[in-house]
Regions:
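Membrane-embedded alpha-helical bundles that constitute the cytochrome b-like, heme-associated redox core
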Residues: 1-201
Length: 201
C-alpha cells in the first residue's frame, strides 16, 4: 500500500497542490484581493507556507523510520525544494515589493531587527541544501558529506520558527506549536543517533 511506486505516482498531484497556493496568492495580489495590506499579507502567507513545508520535510525523515512508511522518503526532496521556492518568494516580496531593492535599508533592517536576522540566516542555510539536492551532487560530494550538509535543515527549521515567533505580536500559539514540533523531531533524531551503536550491538 505504501510502496515507493505509489508515492512516486502521487508526486504530480502533490506538486500541483503545493504550487497552487503561490499562484492563487499571486492572482489575488494582482487583482487587489489580498486585504488592506496586500504586501504584508503576501509575505505572511508565503513565509508560513515555507515553514510548514520545512516541518513536513522533517516529519517525513522521522516517518520514514517506520517500516510501512519507509518509502515516503521519496517525497522529501520535492517538498524540501518547494520550501526553498516559497522562502525565495517570501524574501523576494520583502526586498522587491516591500522595500523596492533599497539594499542599504534592507541590510540595516536585517542587522537591527532580530526576527529578520533569524529569517535571513535561515534563508542562507537553505541555499546549500537546495543547491546540493540533485543525485549528481550527492555523487560528487559523497553521501557522508552530503548528509552532514543536510543536517542544516534543523537549524533552518529552528531559525525559521524563531523568525515566526518574534514576528507574531499577539497570539503566539501557532509559532509555539511549530517550535514544539521541531524540537520533538530534533530530539527524536538525537535520540536515534545516540542509541544507534547500542542497537547495533
Amino acid at each position: 500500500m505504501f510502496s515507493t511506486r505509489n508515492f512516486n505516482r502521487s508526486k504530480p498531484v502533490l506538486f500541483i497542490l503545493i504550487l497552487f497556493p503561490s499562484l492563487l496568492w499571486a492572482y489575488q495580489f494582482v487583482t487587489g484581493n489580498l486585504g488592506v495590506n496586500p504586501i504584508e499579507k503576501l509575505m505572511d502567507e508565503l513565509g508560513l507556507m515555507a515553514l510548514r513545508l520545512i516541518i513536513i520535510t522533517l516529519m517525513i525523515t522521522t516517518l520514514s523510520n517506520i517500516k510501512p512508511l519507509k518509502s515516503i522518503v521519496v517525497l522529501r526532496r520535492m517538498i524540501g525544494l518547494f520550501a526553498f521556492y516559497y522562502v525565495c518568494l517570501h524574501f523576494s516580496t520583502y526586498i522587491v515589493l516591500d522595500h523596492f531593492l533599497d539594499m542599504k535599508f534592507i541590510i540595516q533592517d536585517i542587522i537591527k531587527r532580530p526576527f529578520i536576522t533569524f529569517g535571513f540566516i535561515s534563508f542562507l542555510f537553505l541555499i546549500p541544501l537546495a543547491s546540493t539536492s540533485t543525485n549528481k551532487m550527492i555523487k560528487r560530494l559523497g553521501f557522508k558529506l552530503w548528509k552532514k550538509i543536510h543536517y542544516l535543515i534543523y537549524p533552518v527549521a529552528i531559525l525559521a520558527s524563531m523568525h515566526f515567533y518574534v514576528l507574531v505580536r499577539a497570539d503566539k500559539t501557532e509559532p509555539v506549536i511549530y517550535m514544539g514540533i521541531i524540537i520533538l523531531l530534533l530530539l527524536h533524531r538525537i535520540f536515534k543517533r545516540l542509541t544507534r551503536p547500542q542497537l547495533a550491538q
